[in-house]
Regions:
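Residue-level signal for well-ordered alpha-helical positions
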Residues: 19, 49, 94-95
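Arg/Lys-rich, positively charged N-terminal/basic patches that mediate binding to nucleic acids
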Residues: 1-42
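A generic structural signal for secondary-structure junctions
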Residues: 24, 51, 96-99
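A short, surface-exposed loop/turn module that caps and links secondary-structure elements
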Residues: 44-73
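Enriched for short, Lys/Arg-rich terminal
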Residues: 72-102
Length: 102
């Protein structure tokens, strides 16, 4: 199994900041930070598990990147969309699982 270096795209950073801002409005500050840290850990885990995920067949996900793969978060609320280039796993977007059409 190969290990990749994870890079977070600008669009994914914006998505993450929007999610974190939303969490601050809904949860207490400590709970929101704990949730955000869990999401960061999941993103870091892509470095190890990137090869385990097959290319997506969803047209919506493929419109983001033609070689896109997806990883669903631990609570199945978020979808991390990424692709692999050379030694890098590049996270393209973080979307709500409810918005992904099959």
């Amino acid at each position: 199994m190969r290990e990749y270096r994870v890079i977070i795209n600008r669009a994914a950073r914006v998505d993450f900041l929007e999610i974190r801002t939303f969490l601050w409005g809904v949860l207490s500050f400590q709970s929101a930070e704990k949730y955000a840290n869990a999401m960061r850990a999941e993103i870091k885990s892509i470095s190890i598990f990137a090869d385990c995920f097959q290319r997506s067949t969803s047209k919506q996900i493929l419109s983001i990147h033609p070689q896109a793969r997806r990883m669903v978060s631990h609570n199945k609320r978020w979808v991390y969309i990424f692709h692999i280039e050379d030694d890098f796993a590049i996270v393209d977007r973080i979307l709500s699982a409810k918005n992904i059409k099959q």
